[in-house]
From Swiss-Prot:
This is S-adenosyl-L-methionine-dependent tRNA 4-demethylwyosine synthase TYW1. One of its GO terms (molecular function) is FMN binding. FMN binds at residues 85-89, 176-208. The gene is TYW1. Residues 400-644 form the Radical SAM core domain. Residues 287-301 have a biased composition (Acidic residues). Residues 259-286 have a biased composition (Basic and acidic residues). [4Fe-4S] cluster binds at residues 416, 420, 423.
Length: 732
């Protein structure tokens, strides 16, 4: 048998397969393709059956033999509300906003910026799908509140630090509402603007235009800061609802000027890509132009602005800015002509807005004020209550013979031009540099002031300890202290009001904060005119009084000079704040020479309790011995004056000019009946028959003098002291 033939028979099938391998591969490929097609058809038919059997909103997908519900897209996972507050207003707004957000079934968190570390946590908001809301207030000198100080410092530094870059917060969504007072024009809502700007510079996306709340009821867009916030909140909730649905409302690309949004135009998205770098460069060069502000309510129109939607050369930015400014001015002029600006500071009826807003009314009512009309108030002094019980009167009783239980403390103007750190009213009253509110007539103010005062006195009828004769006397007002709150001299009809007081045989004690020299010069004669001298240098006055006027120091000096020409009794009121203004003796002496006052009251600051608006504590209240030491040192520098009286209970001393020391006796008290005769003669003569302070002075009793054993306490009354004696913490 041939071996080669056997070998051929063994390998011949394999050789045949090799020769026909192409056809074999082709068959396999066709088979696999057919199998894949069959599987696709089967799955497609199964999916169609599921779509028909299950509601569209809850379609199921078959995955590895299991049924799973299709996940719904989440566009907003929650809202974080950050607040920086000093007096609690921003915190209150945060709570109100949180309630509104909760109604949308969204998780919400309220965060105090004081407890938040942006270095560790702010970057988390890039991917969190949260919307971050910042409610920030502007405080003294345009600075942030204490609670927001670190956050703002960090954010500012990060916005200009190249290590963070322009996209550090890209993906973060935010909105800003600022709280401020346009009376401080140069710093109005500065913190809100800055936070908005810095977030934008770091790449965060603004979901709506910045809101600005204004405490100035006249300039406030909606009449009060609360109304401003409500209007902004409504828009924010509407925007939030749209974001929840995944809708993309047209929002600002960050290239707007002075609240005018350009992003509504066609091609704005392309412009955002192309001109972002140029806008940021221009912003850093001209910060005041605010290219980061926006508004979804206003649009630029016309062909002139189409050029702004394309890439702009850096060299042309100046021309563009001039063009925008010009158009803005033209638009404002057109609005003014059309009467849009006539309603500034007016209500829906076209009348001037009332000074007292609902929130202010609530705050002052809680403090015990009886509010009168739209801008006045009256309150019962604690010394009135004390003297009704026969427990002694205030320092004005000791120094000038006022009957404290017959003294009405009131003001025709709750507004003030300062925000003094030691203000008793915790800065709940409005501020302003001129009268811009609705004005009530002086006759109505005086009538209601007396009625309200009498009603408060009536509440003491039958109260244990109240003396019947004092109660009856208290029903007849004999003195009026225009020192309650605010700046009474701002009231345009203050002279008429004073004349009405004198016609009612009521003496007048008017206190002014030395910021209105012209009004002081034009003031009609009063029984006694006070000027608050809270500091003796420009820097310390700014620190303590926090005035609105930019030229506050010159106004202060001019007010003191205006006092020098007054013929009636004039008084400097010095309030000592420990560690703030007690080391300026020489400067105080120089101020005395400007106004040559008849008297100088030196009083330790009154502690009014804790307040978020003030940093004063009991540590700032000087002991009476410290006040006495200060007065001794001051008198050594002003040779025409001596220490006359003391009221230890009020932590107060009186320095008097030597002209009131006659025959070795002090005549600091007032003959009130004689004053009424003199003022009547003055009025009858049309102002030609003048009189001076010495014409109605009266001898000071021995118990009121400095050095007397009574220390200013009237021996007719019964001394009442608390068991735990401490610093004097209240006064009038």
């Amino acid at each position: 048998m041939d071996p080669s033939a056997d070998t051929w028979d063994l390998f011949s099938p394999l050789i045949s397969l090799w020769i026909n391998r192409f056809y074999i591969y082709l068959g396999f490929a066709v088979s696999i393709s057919l199998w894949i097609c069959v599987q696709i058809v089967i799955k497609t038919q199964g999916k169609n059956l599921q779509e028909k059997s299950v509601p569209k909103a809850a379609q199921d997908l078959m995955t590895n033999g299991y049924v799973s519900l299709q996940e719904k897209d989440i566009f907003v996972s929650g809202v974080k509300i950050f607040y920086g507050s000093q007096t609690g207003t921003a915190k209150g707004f945060a709570t109100v906003l949180a309630e509104a957000v909760t109604s949308l079934d969204l998780p919400v968190a309220i965060i105090n910026l004081k407890e938040y570390d942006p270095d560790d946590h702010l970057i988390e908001e890039v991917t969190s799908k949260n919307v971050c809301v910042f409610l920030v207030a502007t405080y003294t000198d345009g600075l942030p509140t204490e609670s927001a100080e670190w956050f703002c410092k960090w954010l500012e530094e990060a916005s200009i630090d190249f290590r963070f870059g322009k996209t550090y917060l890209k993906g973060m969504r935010y909105a800003v509402f600022g709280l401020g007072n346009s009376a401080y024009a140069s710093h109005f809502n500065k913190v809100g603007k800055n936070v908005d700007k810095w977030l934008w510079m770091l790449g965060a996306h603004r979901v709506m235009s910045r809101g600005e709340g204004d405490c100035d009821v006249v300039k406030s867009k909606h009449g009060s800061i609360e109304a401003d916030f409500r209007a902004w909140k409504t828009k924010f909730i509407s925007q939030l609802q749209a974001l929840q649905k995944g809708e993309r409302k047209k929002s600002c690309g960050g290239h707007c000027k002075k609240g005018k949004c350009e992003s509504h135009q066609h091609g704005s998205e392309e412009r955002e890509e192309g001109s972002h770098e140029q806008d940021e460069l221009h912003h850093r060069d001209t910060e005041e132009e605010e290219p980061f502000e926006s508004s979804s309510e206003e649009e630029f129109g016309g062909e002139d602005h189409q050029s702004l939607n394309s890439i702009v050369d850096v060299e042309d930015l100046g021309k563009i800015m001039d063009h925008v400014k010009k158009e803005k001015r033209e638009k404002e002029q057109q609005e003014e002509k059309s009467g849009l600006f006539r309603n500034m500071g007016r209500n829906e009826d076209g009348e001037r807005r009332a000074m007292i807003t609902p929130a202010l009314r609530e705050a002052l009512t809680k403090q015990g004020y009886q509010l009168i009309g739209s801008h006045s108030g009256v309150k019962l002094c604690r010394w009135t209550k004390s003297m009704l019980r026969g427990r002694g009167g205030c320092y004005k009783h000791t120094f000038y013979g006022i009957e404290s239980h017959r003294c009405m403390e009131t003001t025709p103007s709750l507004a003030c031009a300062n925000k003094c750190v030691f203000c008793w009213r915790h800065h709940t009253n409005p501020v302003g540099t001129e009268w811009r509110w609705k004005m009530d007539q002086p006759e109505m103010i005086l009538k209601e002031a007396i009625e309200n005062h009498q009603n408060m006195i009536k509440q003491f009828k039958g109260v244990p300890g109240v003396k019947a004769e004092r109660f009856e006397e208290g029903m007849t007002v004999k003195h009026c202290a225009l020192s309650l709150v605010g700046e009474p001299i701002m009231y345009p009809e203050i002279n008429r009001f004073l004349k009405l007081l004198h016609q009612c045989k009521i003496s007048s004690f008017l206190v002014t904060n030395a910021q209105f020299p012209a009004e002081i010069r034009n003031l009609e004669p009063v029984t006694q005119l006070y000027v608050s001298v809270d500091a003796s240098t420009k820097d310390s006055l700014k620190k303590i009084d926090r005035p609105l006027f930019k030229d506050f120091w010159q106004r202060f000096l001019d007010s003191l000079k205006a006092l020098a020409v007054k013929q009636q009794r004039t008084v400097y009121r010095l309030t000592l704040v420990k560690a703030w203004n007690v080391d300026e003796l020489q400067a105080y002496a120089q101020l005395v020479s400007l106004g040559n006052p008849d008297f100088i009251e030196v009083k330790g600051v009154t502690y009014c309790g804790e307040s978020s608006a003030s940093s004063l504590t009991m540590a700032h209240v000087p002991w009476h011995e410290e006040v006495v030491q200060f007065v001794h040192e001051l008198v050594d520098l002003i040779p025409e004056y001596e220490i006359a009286c003391e009221h230890e209970h009020s932590n107060c001393l009186l320095i008097a000019h030597r002209k009131f020391k006659i025959g070795g006796e002090w005549w600091t008290w007032i003959d009130y009946n004689r004053f009424q005769e003199l003022i009547q003669e003055y009025e009858d003569s049309g102002g030609s028959k003048t009189f001076s302070a010495k014409d109605y002075m009266a001898r000071t009793p021995h118990w009121a003098l400095f050095g007397a054993s009574e220390r200013g306490f009237d021996p007719k009354d019964t001394r009442h002291q608390r068991k735990n004696k401490s610093k004097a913490i209240s006064g009038c």
